[in-house]
Amino acid sequence: MALKGLDIFKLSPKKNCKECGSPTCMAFCMKVAQGAVSLDKCPYFSEEALATLNSATAPLMKTISVGEHKLGGETVLFRHEKTLVNKNLYAVNVCTCMDEATVDAKLADLQKVDYERIGERMYVEFVFVGNNQADPAVYAELVKKAAATGRSLVLECWDVECAKAALEVCGKDVILDGATPDNWEAMNALATAKGVALGVWAENISDLYDTVKKLEAAGNKNLVLDVTGKTAKETLANADLVRRTAIKDGDRSFGYPSIVNVAKLAKGDAHLQTAYASMFTEKYASIIVMETMTMAQALPLYGLRQNIFTDPQK
């Protein structure tokens, strides 16, 4: 919720001490409302006032930290409205359905995309590790291999026992993408115990919303929403609805970063996956999962991302 300067001034200490660098408390509060300075410049706000103001001014979309990466935290739909805050990140998928040689080749290839463009490192930030096995040891071994790349992980696993085994062999730079309307309680308990972000997926957007509400009621707001649908059209509609519901309608239950798996939407078609990835770079994926990331794919995607997430105010 956007507060006006007068709203903030009503809760201010009204000392006019000038310690913040502004001539009056009213001037300071106007700057806070404009986003020019932060509240912590004034040491005299009461704890109660700070709690009220921080709650009211918190972004409608939460920032979720995964290791060194920050996801979400956006305050606008489009860059020209103000600026976009945290760039989307790319992942390459491996799965227990793949043979060992394929997995090894994919993990080796993703590490070859690592270069600098205009002072920014361009590389594959995540490995997306899928599971179609009932054997926890098999999945844990694959996760261990993926973790050895040094990249953060997204663990797509809906089996609680397999997820437990996987989390034992990797660090905390992980999203456990495993909560569904059927298993959310068990997955929530596991993610909370391990201190990792929990990914949430459902067959449709209504069930996704209901599951998020249940997780929030259980005390978990360290969430990422997997909005991947059956088609690219459905997925784009999901991503757009989730972002607009949070930013425009002010509904914080959809105010979380999102995952889009273009590897599922265009399986085996690298060109179409790249096209889809560019679309979801613009609207509105926080993590985009692909089957591969070659230099031919990376150069246009990372260039596009850097252009979109450059602050137009600077």
Residue ranges and their predicted role:
Residues 2-4, 30-60, 64:
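Non-heme iron-sulfur electron-transfer modules
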Residues 10, 51-80, 85, 89-96, ...:
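Surface-exposed amphipathic alpha-helical tracts and adjacent flexible/coil segments at the periphery
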Residues 12, 32-37, 107-118, 146-150, ...:
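Structural signal for hydrophobic packing residues in well-ordered secondary-structure cores
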Residues 13-31, 40-44:
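Local cysteine-cluster metal-coordination motifs and their immediate loop/turn environment
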Residues 41-42, 116-127, 222, 249-256:
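Flexible, glycine/charged-enriched surface loops at secondary-structure junctions
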Residues 182-314:
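Catalytic alpha/beta core domains of metabolic enzymes, predominantly
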